[in-house]
């Protein structure tokens, strides 16, 4: 009871909210629940591979991508409820992001939460991922003015360089002591697949011959025995599952040289497992771990140990991409952002408009010294039926879909603050004109409210313009293969102009413009009906009705094959793509539920090149 003059008034006693340690425990419990489900997904993948349930594998891959955001929302809701009425919230009862400024007490509280969280990670096996989860939850509570290292893990607090699982993350075999053939048999058998092998001793012999053959070509003359006394085979302890394949990933150490390798496992039509291919060298593994493919399902107690191992095999590939390819996309985003901030600190060039033909949907810019592009959805889109929500749905569709090595993955960010001084004047002017709703200029900072970030590639139209005849031939064949493989995976690109495709470092053609993609099963591929008379044929307007999803492949040549060199190469390899019959047959196969395999390696890497598995059909 409070006395104020002669007036008595009753004030409620302050509600004691949770202590910072309680909040830290709540967030860590949310992460631990997420990671337990993440690991269970990888364990389920092993069962699905053993049973040959490829549709189940596809569903699992899609569902797992959404696990993280579900757990973050769940944890933020629990935290919001726990903080209701506490001093950690603003005076009006809203969460702390209701206004930009925290009180002195709130500032101290949230800084203490981070400090307590660090203490909880001392013996944790996934500390870097837990820090990222903490950031995700905190960003739903705090205003962006507090998105810095006092409140978030902008820099990591726990070192993971020498962190490993209770059971070491990789196993070691010594082929000189027990023989290469026996070592390979034991290496494969130790994964404990609950499904019979077609002929493991035979496959191990083929694998040994392929390995020795490739080693012989790489060893210098007079190098001594092919397998020296230091020879070791080191393999990660979990299989890497994706689509219809499983992969053993490791390294061979011989005569002081490290040889990265992967062994592909496949089920044959009889349901038995075969060793299908040996991938040897960084380029082969780079293709396997490409940003254009679906994420692996891998059971990892300590992801940092797995990533450190992979980084030794793929030194050109950033750890951000490795975490992403293991299905830990948010950790990949965190590392990418840290790398990006580090690069900004140690560079001076300016963000500028990306080279190439301007698109109708996206405003694209780049930093010349950094191998990525930044894509913002325009405020006004000059395409019928296209808006922000539609474009974002298309990009999410690609994220959830099997990209079959032909669609670039993207990182999606919001509330990205960049130094205004690093923007070229013409870029800043273009952003103000085309995407004013997505930028906020605040003093010396430009805040981008929503952006997609992709690997930068050479646009195919620019590549073809300057390519020699042999390189053009390869690129055009790759372009047609990309269209075929996308269609077989139930993706119709929509706009197939060359400017919407890029060429990777290894010469692979990849699609990267997603605003017009649709499922093949939604399309109607038609032949152009005969003209009723000569005037109709000469008219600029079609003489036949055209539905919203009608496609006439006979028209493709008019838009795509104006360059005689490109036309000749295309007709040599892909003339059937200019007729509706191929598209109709492909659509029918997809509608039947057939799952076709796209090997992330060339035929010459296969141990049984004559035994390509047939397409699978739904049960």
Swiss-Prot record:
Q: Does the keyword 4Fe-4S apply?
A: no
Molecular-function GO term, any one: protein serine/threonine kinase activity
GO annotations of cellular component type: cytoplasm
A GO biological process this protein is involved in? glucose metabolic process
- Pfam assignment, any one: AceK_kinase
Q: Which UniProt keywords apply?
A: ATP-binding, Cytoplasm, Glyoxylate bypass, Hydrolase, Kinase, Nucleotide-binding, Protein phosphatase, Serine/threonine-protein kinase, Transferase, Tricarboxylic acid cycle
Task: Provide the catalytic activity annotation.
Answer: L-seryl-[isocitrate dehydrogenase] + ATP = O-phospho-L-seryl-[isocitrate dehydrogenase] + ADP + H(+)
The residues that the entry says bind ATP are: 354-360, 375
Major place of residence: cytoplasm
**Family from the record:** Belongs to the AceK family.
> What job does the chain carry out?
Bifunctional enzyme which can phosphorylate or dephosphorylate isocitrate dehydrogenase (IDH) on a specific serine residue. This is a regulatory mechanism which enables bacteria to bypass the Krebs cycle via the glyoxylate shunt in response to the source of carbon. When bacteria are grown on glucose, IDH is fully active and unphosphorylated, but when grown on acetate or ethanol, the activity of IDH declines drastically concomitant with its phosphorylation.
Q: Can you say what this protein is called?
A: Isocitrate dehydrogenase kinase/phosphatase
